Amino acid sequence: DVLVFGMPQKFHYGDGMGTNPIMMMQALSAQVLRFKRVMSDNCVIICSSICNGYFHDELWPYLREQYELFQHDHMNTLPDMNRLGEYFATNEEYIRKYRYTNAFHPFHGFSMMSCGHIAEMNTSAIYIVGAEEPGYARGMGLKTRATFEEALEDAKKKYVGQEPNILALPMTFKKAAVHLCMKDPAQDCMDEYGHRHPCCC
């Protein structure tokens, strides 16, 4: 019912992965993809992040602009940003930074947003705890609380009831990722490639 883990500032794609709000969503969604087999239908994620507004503009020079655009102009969910993909992918300054300064390609942000939407589709709520600049998390549709305890109490009241099953993953993003499955294959609604079995629909 509840997944609990922390998100360091630097992992996977680089420094800022756990503080840049779009990259945070990608990381949260990656966890959903890894644990979907064991998550309940009303699952909640509680994740710690300093969420301090560090975008690492040198590595992802386009993500601050993408984040700002997501806050306006009828952008209600991440897929609403799709119409801007070609604009970013052909932005000459962002392409120059990709070619000459080791930045990611500007279309990479759309890949991250596409993945990032998976977390919203497959959870009842996602809480970020301990954020220094919580508005960045709220700007991505995440809930914010000061502590794990506050987040868990809110989740119990609103989503998972008073005795939820809690999976705590303290080494998340620090060691190799695991993909969890049900012990009984008949209860596992996905095969080893993530395809849903007909009996689970």
Regions found by a protein language model. Name each.
Residues I22-Y127:
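C-terminal catalytic subdomain
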Residues D1-M23:
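Accessory "access/gating" subregions that flank catalytic or transport cores
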Residues V4-M7, F11, M39, C43, ...:
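Structural signal for hydrophobic packing residues in well-ordered secondary-structure cores
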